[in-house]
């Protein structure tokens, strides 16, 4: 029997950061991973706001299969439809809350609920800040159920030069959770040692300049008020 391609469900919701969902689909397509996409109505609104140059049909074309968020009878709503898991990118607090309570409101939360009951991998790229206690409790509840809450917090040790590099690194780390190698991650190799040098002693006039009175301009810093 021929080995089936890796299959993932991708959910896109109305939280800011739709670029994560778009880039995720692009990378998975390049990796020849079978993707099943469902984007909520709020997600479609966010797509139009944040990525106006990308038409909805073009986003759909990145996926292997696309479902309406109201299609509760879709294949991905059943546990018998085998997948490696699901990634919600980005994940809104509303979607997080629906998953935490098990009261599913659309196909995104229903598919996520199925992933949890089948003990498959669910990754939620939660995009919200600051968080109140209810959000934190929902995060704890889905974690106890087996989900992985993965806020897309950028890494700075690779010293990214552009937002695209931050997005790529984050997507690469998320796909690490599914053992999908993308080549997008700058792997940490340990702290680089710097040659020990004795700090230069400041000159007397520099010491004097460092201490200014309120209202005066400090030549080594911003105006003190």
Q: What kind of region is each of these model predictions?
A:
Residues 1-123, 129-225:
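A cross-family phosphate/adenosyl-ligand binding-site feature
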């Amino acid at each position: 029997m021929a080995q089936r391609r890796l299959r993932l469900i991708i959910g896109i919701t109305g939280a800011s950061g739709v670029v994560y969902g778009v880039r995720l689909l692009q990378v998975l397509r390049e990796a020849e991973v079978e993707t099943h996409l469902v984007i909520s109505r709020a997600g479609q609104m966010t797509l139009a706001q944040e990525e106006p140059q990308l038409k909805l049909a073009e986003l759909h074309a990145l996926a292997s299969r696309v479902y309406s968020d109201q299609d509760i009878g879709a294949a991905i709503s059943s546990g018998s439809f085998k997948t490696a898991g699901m990634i919600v990118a980005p994940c809104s607090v509303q979607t997080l809350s629906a998953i935490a309570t098990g009261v599913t409101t659309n196909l995104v939360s229903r598919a996520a609920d199925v992933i949890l009951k089948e003990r498959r991998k669910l990754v939620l790229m939660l995009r919200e800040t600051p968080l109140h206690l209810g959000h934190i409790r929902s995060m704890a509840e889905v974690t106890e159920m087996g989900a992985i809450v993965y806020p897309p917090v950028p890494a700075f040790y690779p010293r990214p030069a552009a937002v695209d590099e931050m997005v790529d690194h984050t997507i690469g780390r998320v796909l690490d959770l599914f053992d999908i190698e993308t080549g997008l991650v700058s792997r940490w190799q340990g702290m680089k040692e710097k040659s020990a040098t004795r700090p230069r002693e400041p000159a007397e006039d520099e010491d004097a300049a460092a201490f200014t009175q309120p209202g005066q301009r400090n030549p080594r810093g911003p105006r003190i008020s």
